[in-house]
């Protein structure tokens, strides 16, 4: 059996995050939305809000926590991709939107999930 690749681990982390959020009442709208401006891992609905979610995975102790890896440049790409999604879908019926981050760290085979709601905002 070949070892898991970086992409495999990312997909596993996204699946874990999706199940975690669904267990907390969010409904999946789309996974892995791609456009030329960037990618959004998960797009979900939380009551009346549309939620754009970035999932980050890190092994404990390597380069800080998963959530710390969301740089301003990454935030800008997520915002641009979300704007593209909203334009393409007609503004998603003018629902309020937010950006969440799910950080998953693994230590000694155990996963720790941290959900940061409203992790950053769009500056107007």
Swiss-Prot record:
One of its GO terms (molecular function) is nucleic acid binding. It comes from the Bacteria. Pfam families: UPF0102. Belongs to the UPF0102 family. NCBIfam families: PRK12497.1-3, PRK12497.3-3, YraN family protein. This is UPF0102 protein Noc_0355. It comes from Nitrosococcus oceani (strain ATCC 19707 / BCRC 17464 / JCM 30415 / NCIMB 11848 / C-107). The lineage of its organism: Bacteria, Pseudomonadati, Pseudomonadota, Gammaproteobacteria, Chromatiales.
């Amino acid at each position: 059996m070949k070892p898991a690749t970086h992409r495999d681990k990312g997909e596993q982390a996204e699946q874990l995050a999706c199940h975690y959020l669904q267990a907390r009442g969010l409904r999946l709208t789309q996974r892995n939305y791609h456009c030329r401006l960037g990618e959004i891992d998960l797009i979900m609905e939380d009551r009346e809000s549309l939620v754009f979610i970035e999932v980050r995975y890190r092994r404990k102790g390597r380069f800080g926590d998963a959530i710390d890896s969301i740089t301003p440049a990454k935030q800008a790409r997520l915002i641009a991709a979300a704007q593209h999604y909203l334009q393409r879908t007609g503004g998603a019926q003018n629902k309020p939107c937010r950006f969440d981050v799910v950080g998953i760290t693994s230590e000694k085979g155990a996963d720790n999930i941290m959900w940061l709601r409203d992790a950053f905002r769009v500056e107007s």
